[in-house]
Amino acid sequence: MGLSYQLLLCLLLCGGAKQCCSQPLWLLPGGTPTPGKLTSSVEVECLEAELVVTVSRDLFGTGKLIQPEDLTLGSENCRPLVSVATDVVRFKAQLHECSNRVQVTEDALVYSTVLLHQPRPVPGLSILRTNRADVPIECRYPRQGNVSSHAIRPTWVPFSTTVSSEEKLVFSLRLMEENWNTEKLSPTSHLGEVAYLQAEVQTGSHLPLLLFVDRCVPTPSPDQTASPYHVIVDFHGCLVDGLSESFSAFQVPRPRPETLQFTVDVFHFANSSRNTIYITCHLKVTPANQTPDELNKACSFNRSSKSWSPVEGDAEVCGCCSSGDCGSSSRSRYQAHGVSQWPKSASRRRRHVRDEADVTVGPLIFLGKASDQAVEGWASSAQTSLALGLGLAAVAFLTLAAIVLGVTRSCHTPSHVVSLSQ
């Protein structure tokens, strides 16, 4: 009763059990509490993958030594180690052994088991000198920390390996159907129609990336420096083809961050007998959370408002499209035609660019208007039919002439009459 009154008074004065008792109360059979002297008799060492429990044989602090064989760790009856010391008993077990249970909390992994003291009667007598006791054992490991006693030593990936990993990005440029759902199977288009182009990058295991079309130049051959040429996209993402009498533009919004779609009015090169077109575009990616700027943008020219508008970001990033001064360190191919205008390894010079590549779609066949093609086809068919008719007439005339000539010759041949004598 004295302990109960003291505990009640402490609770009223201090307002909590933690202030009243610095150690947990161990409950014996019958519910009788005893002060936490057992904690000073039991020591637990939590290692990286195991725990070590050291128990004083004077478990209850009464001077009465317990027997080592009366102690077990966990319900699996893990026995103590053999020790030459007479005053302590030691257990050593893996974290998953001796009935250890693991509990995951918000900030820790808690492994718990119990140390059991089950006294046996004194040999030859039916009496006990000590009480039964259950001592909870816990090991707590922070979830956000280093479990090992050694410091973490990071291994940096070599630069060549990093580059190889980045180069696993796969860029593509495809000619699409009008609904953007499937790739167009036929490469043929006519003047007055629209070519639907889709640039895309397969990011694989990379973090989310945002794709940009830096520039695009069509040529009559796969050589991107060939002549004649025409510029569709320039100045790091300005679709300058929309400045001419066309409705070429980027599609808003994007279908995905790693995809960019744009339309181009079909054209052909003047004074060129070739109808094939190869479109080479320089594609690049940046982190998806990076804000578009003058070097990374997708801008279209709005003919109705006579202004530039971006696919995403602030409209100010498109302000340089009119002047062509978009932070480029070299002259644009739109300003001066030359082989060196396509920079190589630009990702090494601009740190904010993760990766980039030149991709080509073609050959695309851009013909005249479909109606013109129909007229030309009808004229060509008529000419073919006329030539065929004249040829047949000539053959018939020659055949008739040969027949007449043969008949004439047969009429002028003399006949010989043979008379037989009687």
UniProtKB/Swiss-Prot annotation:
Positions in the Extracellular compartment: 23-386
One GO molecular-function entry: carbohydrate binding
Residues of this chain annotated as glycosylated in UniProt: T32, T34, N146, T155, T161, T162, N271, N302
Residue stretch(es) of the prosequence: 350-422
GO CC, alphabetical: collagen-containing extracellular matrix; egg coat; extracellular space; plasma membrane
Bridged cysteine pairs (disulfide): C46-C139, C78-C98, C216-C281, C238-C299
Domain ZP per the UniProt entry, residue ranges: 45-306
Alphabetic keyword roster: Cell membrane, Cleavage on pair of basic residues, Disulfide bond, Extracellular matrix, Fertilization, Glycoprotein, Membrane, Pyrrolidone carboxylic acid, Receptor, Secreted, Signal, Transmembrane, Transmembrane helix
Topology of the protein relative to the lipid bilayer: Single-pass type I membrane protein
TM spans (from-to): 387-407
Residues making up the signal peptide according to the UniProt record: 1-22
Residue(s) carrying Pyrrolidone carboxylic acid: Q23
Keyword rRNA-binding: no
Keyword DNA-binding: no
Note on domains (UniProt): The ZP domain is involved in the polymerization of the ZP proteins to form the zona pellucida.
Similarity comment text for this entry: Belongs to the ZP domain family. ZPC subfamily.
Protein name: Zona pellucida sperm-binding protein 3
Protein's organism: Mesocricetus auratus
Gene: ZP3
